[in-house]
């Protein structure tokens, strides 16, 4: 079965309507794009605007397949090896258009602008510097470039930005240890967490325990992916072995009530990405993503967009899907926003400001 791409406004047309436009349409519920929130699950290349991808490809002479041009957003189904290979290939092609420091700076500036337009006051963007190091002088120069670009983007937009350094689970665990040591060097200087991404089926979480132990000793959050393409066993490894503070996706935990209870007891946040789950075939429709079940079980949830470049839906769309497909009330949407803020690494002053804004959103007509 081919997964359907979630219906969404084009990424470039994601500007929230102003109050006059909403009134003209007769909308009576608050606009989720105006709801203050934190965005905790966004990948670096995957955050790029589609128009920027096309423009940079033309500038640098990179040929884009139809799936990234005329047929964008692509139809994906990554629950089998062939489908994941196609997804990863499209991601790698998109990454190849980022060839100069200015390209990286532009990506982060535009991403921060899009976050601000959708109510996100704090962003944690995930990057594996190994994928960019060859072009930018090595791992350390790449990390320093990303951190400097993040500071500039934050200053220009008012969005706080933290960086999560992520290891690739398809690479050797020793590579992950190298990245963990590098991430710790910049703890307190922009790096807030250490992650583990890519295909769960090709790298078990327990193989990376050493890297996560290094990161934890350095004061970084543990934020591995799990429970997306594999079931609750993968989530359990993240919780028990990697001592996860948050889990990227984690939706398959709902299949094991005992595990879900443990997640709730430990207050491990789940970074749930509805549009991505549908786009990759983890769920057939947005209504099948178990957001309501996780929420009612008491799990902390932080909605995320994952890779809007490939799924065509940014952060506000995730809240719209939860509202429309799962019947979340405005009070429940506000609680989801609060949970995203509390699960973040945002400084206390940003947390207080965003939480106050959530309360104001609920009471503003």
Can you annotate each of these PLM segments?
Residues 2-5, 9-220, 229-234, 241-246, ...:
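Metal-cofactor-binding active-site regions of metalloenzymes
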């Amino acid at each position: 079965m081919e997964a359907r791409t979630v219906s969404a406004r084009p990424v470039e047309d994601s500007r929230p309507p102003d109050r006059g436009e909403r009134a003209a349409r007769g909308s009576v519920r608050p606009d989720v794009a105006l709801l203050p929130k934190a965005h905790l699950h966004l990948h670096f290349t995957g955050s790029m605007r589609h128009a920027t991808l096309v423009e940079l490809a033309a500038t640098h002479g990179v040929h884009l397949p139809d799936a990234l041009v005329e047929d964008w957003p692509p139809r994906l189904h990554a629950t089998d090896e062939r489908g994941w290979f196609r997804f990863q290939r499209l991601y790698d092609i998109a990454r190849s258009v980022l060839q100069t420091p200015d390209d990286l700076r532009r990506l982060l500036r535009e991403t921060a602008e899009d976050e601000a337009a959708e109510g996100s006051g704090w962003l944690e963007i995930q990057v594996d510097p190994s994928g960019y190091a060859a072009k930018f002088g090595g791992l350390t120069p790449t990390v320093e470039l990303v951190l400097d670009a993040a500071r500039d983007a934050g200053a220009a937009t008012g969005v706080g930005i933290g960086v999560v350094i992520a290891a690739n689970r398809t690479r050797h665990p020793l590579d992950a240890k190298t990245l963990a040591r590098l991430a710790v060097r910049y703890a307190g200087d922009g790096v807030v967490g250490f992650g583990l991404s890519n295909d769960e089926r090709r790298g078990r979480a327990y193989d990376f325990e050493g890297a996560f132990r290094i990161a934890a000793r350095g004061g970084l959050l543990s934020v591995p992916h799990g429970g997306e393409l594999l079931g609750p066993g993968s989530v359990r490894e993240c919780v028990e072995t990697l001592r996860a503070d948050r889990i990227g996706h984690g939706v398959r935990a709902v299949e094991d009530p005992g595990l879900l209870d443990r997640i709730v007891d430990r207050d491990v946040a789940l970074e749930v990405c509805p549009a991505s789950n549908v786009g990759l075939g983890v769920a057939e429709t947005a209504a099948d993503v178990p957001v309501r079940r996780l929420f009612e079980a008491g799990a902390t949830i932080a909605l995320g967009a994952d890779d809007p470049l490939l799924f065509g839906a940014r952060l506000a769309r995730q809240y719209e899907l939860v509202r429309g497909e799962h019947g979340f009330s405005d009070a429940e949407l506000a609680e989801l926003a609060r949970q995203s803020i509390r699960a973040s690494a945002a400084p206390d002053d940003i947390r207080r400001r965003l939480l106050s804004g959530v309360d104001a959103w609920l009471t503003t007509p």
